[in-house]
Structures are given as C-alpha cells and as structure tokens.
Amino acid sequence: MYIPISITTKRYRAGILLLLLLLPLAAQAGGGGTGKQNPVVKGALWVKTLIDSMAVKGIDRSYISQPKRPWAAELRTEASETVLKMHADFPLNSGNQATMTVTTRNGFSTLAGAWVGYRGYGFGLSKNLSGNGGTLSFGAMGGSFGINFRINTYSSSTPDLRLSYSSRDYNFDEHNIEDLDAPISVRSLFLDGYYMFNGKRFSYAAAYDQSLIQRRSAGSLMAGAMYYHSSAKYDDDANYALVAMMKGVGKLKFTQASIGAGYAYNWVPARGWLVNAMLMPMLQFYNSISAYTYRFYSDGFDATDILFTNYDRILEEVLNGLSDGADDSGGADDSGDEVNIELREGGVETTHNYIGFNFDARLAVVYNWSDWYLRVYGHYNRFRYSNDIGYGHTDEWRVYASLGFRF
C-alpha cells in the first residue's frame, strides 16, 4: 500500500508511535526503583502522568468511570465513500453553453485495519480492500476535549465524465465518455477538535474511543473547529484531453477552516450500552482553492495558444459530432497517427471564496462488557468551493465497526 504522506507527517507519526511504545516502560519505571532514570523514560513517565490526570480531571464519577486497564487495541472495518465533483462551464461563441462535469469517487469501499491507544491517545491504519489507498488516523481525547486527525488517499481510473451541451432546441448529455488511461489521485487531510462544556458529566471519549465509560445519560453543548485540505491530480500526459476540457487545469488543492457550536447527547438505555448523537453547524471562515494550469506541447512545440484560440470551434464540432451520432476515434488525428501531447505546468491561480456553512453530524452505538467493547459509528461532512474556472463540492461519509480489548 502506498500512502503519499509528507516527511513532516512521517516524523510526527513516528514520534507518536515511539511515545506509545515508551509508555509501558514508563509505567514500569514508575512502579519503583531509586536509580537514576533515563531522560527518555523520565520524559515518557511525565507524559503518562499528564495523560492519566487529564483523562479524569473534573469528572463526576457517578456519571463517568474509567476502565482499570489503560491500554486498548481494536480491529476495525470501515465502509466509506468520498465523492469529489468538479464543474467547468464554457460559454461558446455561438451562444450555446457547454459544461464539463467530472465526478470521482472511491466507490462504496471497505477498509480493514487496526488501532492501538493509551487512555484515549492512539493511532490507527486501514487499507482499502477493494482498491488503492488507505487511511491513517490519530486521536486524542480527554475529559473535556477531543481531537481527531486523518489522512485518506484513493485513486480512480473510472470517474463519471459528463459533457453537457445546451442549445435553443435541445440538451445533449454524454456520460462516461471514456475511462482514463491514468488515474485521478485524491488525497485529503482532516483535522477537528471539540470542547465539551459539560465535561463533568458528559464524555465524548466514552462514545468514540472507550477510554472512559458513560454510566448515566447526559448531554453537553460543544464548541468545535475543523481544518480540511484536499488535492486532486489528473495531470498525466495521457489525460491531456481531460485537462483541456477542464480549461487547462490538471491539479486542484482545496483548503478550508471552520468553527461551530452544537450539541451532543449520550443516552445510556441499559448497563453497558451507549447511544451517542452529535450535530454541529459550522461557519466556514476560510475557503481557498488553488488551480494549477498546464501548457500543451506537441513534439517540443507549445501549442497551448493555438488550442485555446480555436477552443470554441473545436469543442462545438466535437459536441455536434457526438449529438449527431458520429464515431469519435479519440486519441488520433485524421491520418491515423497518434497524437503525442506533453503537459508542462504553467502557473497557479488561488481564489479565496466567500464565507459559507457546513455541518458535522455523528452517531455512535457502543456496548461494553468486561474488558471488551463493540462500537459502531458514522459521520458525514460536505465541503464546497468555487472560482473563476469552475465550482464543485466534496462529500464524505464513513461508517466504522470496531471490536476492542483493554489490557
């Protein structure tokens, strides 16, 4: 499995892994002994003590309890779908309108993986069983806060390509014009954090990582913040036709930041059971898109200006040919020779969008028994963007099922 993660992220992950591996040593070191401690072990012991105290600070023990065993490991399965939809509009010289819509998705995919953590601090890794890509996640949850970090990657060679052509008399749609010779690669980074105003009686961790156990029903107002960054690349030379139809754009990067307030409730219908629901409307105060444009070279000659000078005429002829039922040979000229196009990066245009709204919705069902627990939960997010080149949105939903064991 290949997950393209930056060097900084790799070091961050390695540091978290090292810290988690050192915690058992710190626990052993804290059990006794008067000799001089190794500075690394001493530092890990300090972190362990801090985590232990933060996990239960200020909680009402009649509502929330802490498991005796601090470590937890779980096997996870995940059903998910991420959909990225991009539009590019073309007002033609004839007065007609053309729209290119690219919808790429990882499909209804299933991931399998594992997670390990200590008192609500842990990381997990999942692999897509039906295709490329996977998910790397890290979480930190205390008595009154929760932080989630996730990197997700996938690629698709079979996006839904829709070319729409409108005139005064009719509308013409051509779906799935062709599969791509090179896949569209999508990578997303997701970071969110929450603060619970009723952390004394309500536990977010009890619903989403089981480092605490909710004993009685309780709810809480919440404040939250979210950061989302995603990129889509389809700039391979084999995709030159798609890049041309997207107005020369072969790579997009989206960055969004939101803040919000909402409410969450933990319902305890019977001993060991917990049902959680959370809804948080969010104000999107930062929303930018960077569009990377490309130049088209043929045998070393820059043909970009010639292509786009005659763009309207060429596109109109293609659309009229499709609407008349003409056969599109695609990838060859009239002589039958292959068309060799090389894409070279030209420039980048960054647009800052208007303030908008999105929401974060989550639902979880948990059952605890002895040192075991079973959890099923899901969430949904939508992110929008627009610029002078086009507009679109990203939809993401996930449903997880986890079987965990405390030790």
Locations of the language-model features?
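Short loop/turn motifs that connect adjacent beta-strands in outer-membrane beta-barrel proteins
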Residues: 30-42, 47-70, 198-219, 269-275
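Outer-envelope beta-barrel architecture signal
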Residues: 39, 67-73, 110, 119-121, ...
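Residues on the lipid-exposed face of transmembrane beta-strands in outer-membrane beta-barrel proteins
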Residues: 75, 112-118, 136-142, 191-197, ...
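Outer-membrane beta-barrel translocator/channel fold
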Residues: 78-94, 152-189
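Outer-membrane beta-barrel translocator domains and adjoining extracellular loop/strand segments
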Residues: 85-92, 137, 160-165, 204-208, ...
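Outer membrane beta-barrel transmembrane domains
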Residues: 86-100, 112, 120-122, 146, ...
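Extracellular loop and loop/strand-boundary signature of outer-membrane beta-barrel proteins
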Residues: 97-100, 174-182, 208-209, 245-251, ...
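Short sequence motifs at beta-strands and strand-loop junctions characteristic
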Residues: 103-106, 115, 128-130, 183-185, ...
